[in-house]
Amino acid sequence: MAWTVFIDGKEGTTGLRIFDRLAERGEFSLLTLPEEKRKDADARREAIHAADIAILCLPDAAARESVALAEGSNTRILDTSTAHRVAPGWAYGFPELSKKHRDAVVSGQYVAVPGCHASGFIALAAPLVAAGLIPVDALLSCFSLTGYSGGGKKMIAQYEADTRTPDLDAPRPYGLTQSHKHLPEMQQISCLTHAPIFAPIVADYYAGMQVTIPLFRQQLNCAHPVEELTACLKAHYASSPIVSVLDAQDVAAFGGFIPANAPAGKDSMKLMVLGNDDRIELVSLFDNLGKGSSGAAIECLNLMTGAPETTGLNL
């Protein structure tokens, strides 16, 4: 079957990557609008209604507008924005979390692609909370290092400009008021009573993300955390072709340093349990533009259209 797809907002970083990836696949027919019509509500409505699936690569307000424009159609919506990730009636597009999540993506009319930082946090926390190893009322903290491509076209231009300012040479913490837009999904999808303290950091490299959750043994419901947390994550992701858990020898291959840009260009995600049985670090390593963005969208689209989950992914 040929699927008609309209990417609303294909001019942005995520939209362009999705468009280019789908253009290489014969099962998709891509609807496009001329430049002068891409913000025209009537033209967008017509394209959305003509599509089998509309992929929204827009700011939150515009994504909500597109969903409203889709009313009265049978078009399925795949939204990459923050607007609907914890909204009732929307499937959360991280199918590795559970059969329920996978089935919701497969059959849902409305699917929300997870946030990049949130993906790394939830991949680690959600299975451990579900298993009871992390209490639901745990007071967690998390820091996340990302390449500057996560900031979109404007930030990419700032970092790559000949006239860039010296402050861009250093890592830059942001989200300083603990109101980052990924926090609601980090809490809700992980089934936590409290949102974590979240410290995102953007650094001077293009792509790649490393999310870390530091823990004391006293925060956990286990006596041998490194062994037990690793075993839990390995069991949870045993059947996943995309998310995997590294063994000690795999971690040792990094030589004592984990480069956050190592997964650039990949759509996979690697998880690690580091430290010792008193002080532990849970780490996820992936491309913010891959499993953190366009790769996750392609994975969801594959499931929505009945294609093999990894079709078109670079693992």
Regions found by a protein language model. Name each.
Residues A2-Y174, L274-N276:
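N-terminal Rossmann-like NAD(P) cofactor-binding subdomain of oxidoreductases
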Residues G9, T13, C116-A123, T177-P184, ...:
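Conserved active-site and cofactor/substrate-binding residues in soluble primary-metabolism enzymes
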Residues F19, I122-V129, L183-Q187, T230, ...:
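Predominant activation on well-ordered alpha-helical scaffold segments within soluble catalytic domains
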Residues L31, I197-A199, L246:
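General small-molecule cofactor/ligand-binding pocket signal
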Residues S107-Q109, M209-V211, D278-I280:
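Short amphipathic alpha-helical segments
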Residues Q178-Y206, Q210-T212:
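Oxyanion-binding "anion nests"
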Residues P214-L315:
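C-terminal active-site/capping subdomain that shapes the small-molecule cofactor and substrate pocket
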